[in-house]
Amino acid sequence: KPSSAASDVYKRQVHDILGVAVFLIAFSAIVFFAPEFGGYFLEYNNFIPADPLKTPPHIAPVWYFTPYYSVLRAVTDDFLMFWMTPFLILYALLVLGTARYTSVKVITVAAVLALIAGFFLIEAKFWGVVGMGAAVLILFTMPWIDHSPVRSIRYRPGWHKWVYGVFVVVFLVLGYLGVQPPEELRNLVAKIGTLLYFAFFMLMPWWSAMGEFKSVPDRVTFAAH
């Protein structure tokens, strides 16, 4: 019989069949009873006969692309000049004041200056596409920009959960706005959400290392032999 912490590990069993059954029930319900799922899985426009003389007033992408579509629409000339430019300047100052290596400072300042110059020289449509692509690619930088000394959220400061919670809410709001027709208030919210989305990742090297972390038990640490 295992003892102490090891016994707890054996008690915490994962029932794979239960999880698979729940997934198959939900999957089958959608496939057989609601394949269009309110127009989000299969868009209503796909069921309308094509009319070459008439363009639909509003075209929205599939639901899993809508957050990034909101980023695309949020990038306007005003957003680049009055939102992103001040943010990038403050970001460069933060790097200059905290980075240890001179090469990091030089690369950051050069990149910020190049981006700001590009905002003035290239139209916003181009930067909208760049922003949409960057919103996807920035997810792959997580292993390098997360400077937390522990991996599990269980041992991180409590306010880190609030940061992740705000990010999830922002992502869902961007997804909702992506399926709605554009209007002034929605565009403003999308701009705020876009700025918060990128700030979450760009500031992660700092905020992920802040706070009081709990000590990690020996049973969950790996020591190479």
Annotate the PLM regions:
Residues 37-82, 117-121, 125, 129:
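Membrane-interfacial catalytic/cofactor-binding modules of polytopic membrane enzymes
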Residues 145-148, 205-219:
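Membrane-interface capping segments at transmembrane-helix boundaries
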Residues 11-26, 105-110, 156-164:
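Alpha-helical transmembrane segments and their helix-start/interface "positive-inside/aromatic belt" motifs
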Residues 21-47, 170:
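Hydrophobic alpha-helical membrane-insertion segments
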Residues 97-101, 141-157, 179-184:
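Alpha-helical transmembrane segments
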Residues 189-201:
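Small-residue-rich transmembrane alpha-helices that serve as helix-helix interface/gating elements
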Residues 1-6, 10:
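Single conserved hydrophobic/aromatic residue that forms the stacking wall/gate
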Residues 57, 61-62, 84-95, 106-115, ...:
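Hydrophobic membrane-spanning alpha-helices of multi-pass integral membrane proteins
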